[in-house]
């Protein structure tokens, strides 16, 4: 049986809730991807062209710094990476996370939360950050998703 990690970034707490439920449902370790400089409410105002999140998402090379690295990443074979959908893709801090480790031979499975967007071009944007890893198609969940639905999703992945 492979060792699993649920790593997640959550700006508002919604993705954190889904990540915690997923980790419990599949018996995985959990790790919060925290930005070195926390996002403020103003930073997250997607309607403001000068907001930090808008600037980051409009720059494909943007890599926001992460506060803490996971020391034992080499111990994991399967990594579920959770995030809110921003501009129809993963926030660029997810690229920072993936590029911070040697992912060779690992299986990466994105999962996301959104108020109405689907997974969009998330995998297309994440693939260059997953060198040497197997990147599976991601899925968007509502904040109300339960253990049973998450466990069934993971079972369906046939890991």
Regions found by a protein language model. Name each.
Residues 83-84:
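Glycine-rich, N-terminal phosphate-binding loop of Rossmann-like dinucleotide-binding domains
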Residues 109-146:
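Short, glycine-/small-residue-rich phosphate/pyrophosphate-handling segment
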Residues 87-88, 116:
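Acidic catalytic loop of the alpha/beta-hydrolase fold
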Residues 73, 99-105, 129-130:
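Short, conserved loop/helix-junction motifs that constitute active-site signature segments
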Residues 1-78, 88-90, 95, 99, ...:
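N-terminal beta1-alpha1-beta2 submodule of the flavodoxin-like/Rossmannoid cofactor-binding fold
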